[in-house]
Amino acid sequence: MTREIICSALVQTAAVLSLAACAHAQQASPDAMARATEDLENWRKGRVRIYMDDFGELKRYRAANAKLKPPAAGEKRVVFFGDSITDMWPFATAFPGKPYVNRGISGQTTSQMLVRFRNDVIALAPKVVVILAGTNDIAGNTGPMSLEDIEGNVATLVELARAHGIRVVLSSVLPVHNYTVTAMLRFPRRPPEQIAALNKWLKAYAASSGSIYVDYATPMSDDRGLLKKGLAEDGLHPNAAGYAVMTPLAEQAIAKALQGS
């Protein structure tokens, strides 16, 4: 298995066409596929503009961070740090009354997260940080990344947290599926075998670094090893049912991390 992740438009298009013929995937009309492809390409063009203007997207939480008061005495603040899966998590209903801070940014890779880790995590003085990252690195959102590149970035995030007395919950990357039109476009950029390889490393690294590992992938996978269709319409981002699976697992991992804080 190659460990280099290629973000080539030609490779992506060829993979999409082959998946459309897959017996397990939902059949899509040419018009539907064309619209979905155009939407994805427009999204990617928009991301390029963001990368040129503010690579780490430091401005996203600048005002919110400035308004956030230091933790009160005895407060067990937790920062959730990641990409769209964190960004879209409905904290108000999932974690009511908890001192949890959401610092997810859609589309981000670990390279971008390193840029903003001081501002969006360290400066907020949490007891625990929950890191969920890697799927967009595999997809090549900010350029080709080998698994070793992703692992190095994650290790640096963990080392930075531990150097500042912050306990770490390291999350598995969620599986993906190709059961809908939109999902068929996202699927080729996130090969399941690469997600599995990264998760294997994340679990081992969590153990060796004294972090807590939270496994979302296993309970969210179907018998093919893909994300259960009912947990995400687009094959990637959890819906309410998906977050309902994730929330108690996150809470259990945070509780374990706080025991050692």
Predicted regions and their residues:
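Active-site segments of SGNH/GDSL-like serine hydrolases
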Residues: 132-138, 158-195
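Charged, glycine-enriched surface loops/patches
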Residues: 147-171, 201, 205-211
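Extracytoplasmic/secreted envelope proteins and their assembly/folding machinery
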Residues: 114, 118, 147, 151-158, ...
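N-terminal secretory targeting modules
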Residues: 1-79, 87, 91, 124, ...
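Loop/turn elements at helix/coil->beta-strand transitions in domains of secreted/extracellular proteins
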Residues: 75-77, 98-99, 125-129, 163-169, ...
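Oxyanion-hole/transition-state-stabilizing segment in secreted/luminal serine hydrolases
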Residues: 80-81, 86-105, 110-153, 175-180
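Catalytic His-Asp segment of secreted/periplasmic serine-dependent ester chemistry enzymes
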Residues: 174-261
